[in-house]
Amino acid sequence: MTVKLTIDCMGGDHGPSVTVPAAVNFARSHPDAQLLLVGIESAIRAQLKKLKAQDLPALTVVPASEIVAMDDPVEVALRKKKDSSMRVALNRVKEGEAQACISAGNTGALMAVSRYVLKTLSGIERPAIASALPNPNGYTMMLDLGANVDCEPQHLLQFAEMGHALVSALEGKERPTIGLLNIGEEVIKGNDTIKRAGELLRASTLNFHGNVEGNDIFKGTVDVIVCDGFVGNVALKTSEGLAQMLSNIIKEEFGRSLLTKVMAVLALPVLMRFKKRVDHRQYNGAALLGLRGLVIKSHGSADAYGFEWAIKRGYDAVKNGVLERLARAMEENEGSLEQAARDASGAGHASPIAGQPAEPYAAQSSKA
C-alpha cells in the first residue's frame, strides 16, 4: 500500500529549511511513501538541490504562490490566501490525491481552513487537536490541545468519542479508558461545564474512568484524557518546558568540573536513554480529529527531526485506517451521544446538545 501525504512546506517558523529536509529523510526511510511538497517552488527546489534529492522519485513539488504567516488572522488565511501552501495541500487531500496533510502552520488558520475545505464528520460540531504524551508504559492520548478554548459539555463528550476511536485504531484496544481532566477526582469538583460533561460521560457507553488530575497525565492512569483546548495547550507547553529544563539542568550539573565530566562519560548510556525518553520532539505531530480528512499539526518551532516525527504520525494514521475507523465510530455512536444527553438531562440538567453551539473557531493563537 502506497501512502500519499501532502506537506505544507512553507508553514512554521522555519519553512522549507526544516520541512524539506524532514520530508527527504522520511522518504528515504519509507519506500512505500509518496510525498507532495507544497509551496514556493524555487524555495523547495533549492533545498532539494542542497540535499542532493532533486531526483528522489518519492517526492513531487506542487507549486503554491502564497504563505500563511504564523501571525495571520484566520480570516486572511481563509478568505484572501486561497493559493497558500496550506490551502493547496488540504485541497489535495479533499480531491483524493493524498491521504493526509502535515503542516506546522498557524494553528487557528489550519483549523479554520481544514474545516472549510474538508468539512466535519457527521455528529461532530468541532474538530479537536489530539496528541500522545509519554507515560511509563507507553503514551496517553490527550485532547483538545488548543483548537477550542471554550467548550460546552457535549463537545467534551464528542472529544472523548474521538479519542476512544483513535486509540482503538492505533492500539487495538476495544474499550480504552477515558478520563476527564479536573482539579480533583471527586464528582463535586470543577466548574459547571466539567460537572455536566462528567454526567454525559457517565451516561455514555464509553469506558469512563472518572475525573483525573494533572499529575495523572504522565502516570498512564487512563488511555485518553479529555479537556478543553485552553487547559490542554497550557498542560502541553508546561510539560515540554519542564522536559527541556530537566535536560538543561542535567547537562549543566555534569559539566561543572572535571570529575563530573568523567562521571558523565561513565553515565552516558543512561543519559542518552533519559534524553530520548523526555525528548518532546518524538511526540511532535497532533491529529486534527473530526474532519473528513487526516490533518497532522506540527509545532511551529519544530526542527527537522521533530517535523519528521509529525510526518510519521500522518503515515501511521493512514496505515492504521484512523479516518475510516473514526468516521465509522462516530456514525455508530451518534445515537448513543444523544441518548447520553437525554440520560444526563433526566439526572437534573437540560440537555446541552439542545443548546446553541458556541463560536467554532475559539483558538486564534498563532503557534501551537
Swiss-Prot record:
Pathway: Lipid metabolism; phospholipid metabolism. Gene3D superfamilies: Isopropylmalate Dehydrogenase (3.40.718.10). GO terms for cellular component: cytoplasm. GO terms for biological process: fatty acid biosynthetic process; phospholipid biosynthetic process. GO terms for molecular function: phosphate:acyl-[acyl carrier protein] acyltransferase activity. It is found in: Cytoplasm. It catalyses: a fatty acyl-[ACP] + phosphate = an acyl phosphate + holo-[ACP]. It comes from the Bacteria. InterPro entries: FA_synthesis (IPR003664), Phospholipid_synth_PlsX-like (IPR012281). Residues 334-368 are annotated as: Disordered. Keywords: Cytoplasm, Lipid biosynthesis, Lipid metabolism, Phospholipid biosynthesis, Phospholipid metabolism, Transferase. It holds the Pfam family FA_synthesis. PANTHER family: FATTY ACID/PHOSPHOLIPID SYNTHESIS PROTEIN PLSX, PHOSPHATE ACYLTRANSFERASE. Catalyzes the reversible formation of acyl-phosphate (acyl-PO(4)) from acyl-[acyl-carrier-protein] (acyl-ACP). This enzyme utilizes acyl-ACP as fatty acyl donor, but not acyl-CoA. NCBIfam families: plsX. Belongs to the PlsX family. Homodimer. Probably interacts with PlsY. This is Phosphate acyltransferase. It comes from Paraburkholderia xenovorans (strain LB400).
